[in-house]
Amino acid sequence: MTKIKFTKMHGNGNDFIVIDEFENPVPEEKKAAFAKKVCHRRFGIGADGVLFLAKPLHTSLHMRIFNEDGSEAEMCGNGIRCFVKYAVDNGHMNPGKDKVETKAGILEVEARIEDGKTLVKVSMGKPLFDPKKIPAAGLNNFINKPLHGYEVTAVNTGVPHAVIFVDDVNAVDLMKVAPEIRYDLKTFPKGINVNFVQREGHNLRVRTYERGVEGETLSCGTGSVASAAVARYLGYTRDETTVYTAGGQLNISFVSDIAYMEGPAETVYEGEIDVDFSAL
């Protein structure tokens, strides 16, 4: 048995297990199985994903995220905020501006303390509507195309997202209708996250079905950015908007088409778990 220290964190209810690989390296070939084990909410610690804080490949701290099904994601908006808070709290990073390396690229981040809470702002890059970058079927941007009874717009904000505007997000049977779009591999070859969005003036209310979690999460950072990006593209919102989710709110802004996300990150508790890597 190997003792692995962990920190349980959440960003607006989207919860993660942080593993500091400076102290607790997890074998590369075991990461997927480890994530599935510890994320299980009955037989493990319980989380939407595992964040591995790794030694930098270049000049930045390196974040890797594995979903609860063991798949590795390119990026996670709520996850990177938790990652930055952990890094600041544990001396890997100073408050203020820095960079984090992810599979989606190197992202600029900024951590600040306000009323005793850690807020993290992340430069999420330019939302990509090119179907080759999502990926999605077709040669033209995937904008308001009819699919499974809805008008769907697709965009990549680090990971692929489908965005659907409805009158009332709470009236949507998310677990019934979202998987039809998420698993439409003819349209979205790598699968896609699915967001149902309700307009509230220039702000948005969002529910997200997450790929890899295979269910609804209380909040999705990249989904909030995707929803704001599509709303802006369609002329529904301006350069700044607040996105409300079941887990809390995120402030999304755009400067020269670059998306910025700001929101909280919180530590829940710390602990140790015994892991038999030979059995994984």
From Swiss-Prot:
Return the EC number. Answer: 5.1.1.7
Positions of the record's site feature: Could be important to modulate the pK values of the two catalytic cysteine residues: H161, E210
Q: Which Pfam families does this one have? A: DAP_epimerase
Q: Which superkingdom, per the lineage?
A: Archaea
> Where in the cell is the protein located?
Cytoplasm
- Pathway membership, UniProt: Amino-acid biosynthesis; L-lysine biosynthesis via DAP pathway; DL-2,6-diaminopimelate from LL-2,6-diaminopimelate: step 1/1
Keyword vocabulary terms for this entry: Amino-acid biosynthesis, Cytoplasm, Isomerase, Lysine biosynthesis
**Record: residues binding substrate:** N14, N67, G77, N78, N193, E210, R211, G221, T222
UniProt KW Amino-acid biosynthesis keyword: yes
This entry's Gene Ontology molecular function terms read:
diaminopimelate epimerase activity
Primary enzyme class: isomerase
Q: Does the keyword Protein biosynthesis apply?
A: no
Q: What is its main location?
A: cytoplasm
Which residues are the active-site ones?
C76, C220
Q: Which GO terms describe its biological process?
A: lysine biosynthetic process via diaminopimelate
According to its record, what are the GO cellular component terms?
cytosol
Q: Which reaction is recorded as catalysed by this protein?
A: (2S,6S)-2,6-diaminopimelate = meso-2,6-diaminopimelate
Q: Which NCBIfam families match?
A: DapF (TIGR00652)
Quote the function comment for this protein: Catalyzes the stereoinversion of LL-2,6-diaminopimelate (L,L-DAP) to meso-diaminopimelate (meso-DAP), a precursor of L-lysine.
Q: How does it assemble?
A: Homodimer.
Protein family according to the UniProt entry: Belongs to the diaminopimelate epimerase family.
Record-given protein name: Diaminopimelate epimerase
Organism whose genome encodes this protein: Methanocella arvoryzae (strain DSM 22066 / NBRC 105507 / MRE50)
Designated gene of the protein: dapF
